[in-house]
Amino acid sequence: MTYTYATSGTCAKQIDFELDGNMIKSVVFTGGCHGNLQGISKLVEGMNAEEAIKRLRGICCGSKTTSCPDQLAIALEAALEKQQ
């Protein structure tokens, strides 16, 4: 299933991602640091969403209380809740 998440507090404005059950199939960030976000996307594709959440949740960017990886974790949590 495909999801769209509007981020908050980051340079990236939106995350589009696809889950097959709990498996992350694809992730595309809109805005933000293109190279870094492509890297994050490639690293989590094929990963179990719960494992990605565990690894990414709570990461901060500079003085911000969140980051693009943290926002991805929040988006994945919301998607998993919707699947229940």
Region roles according to the model:
Residues 1-4:
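Short, hydrophobic/aromatic-rich segments at coil-to-beta transitions
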Residues 6-14, 19, 23-84:
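Active-site- and interface-proximal helix/loop "cap" or "latch" segments in soluble metabolic
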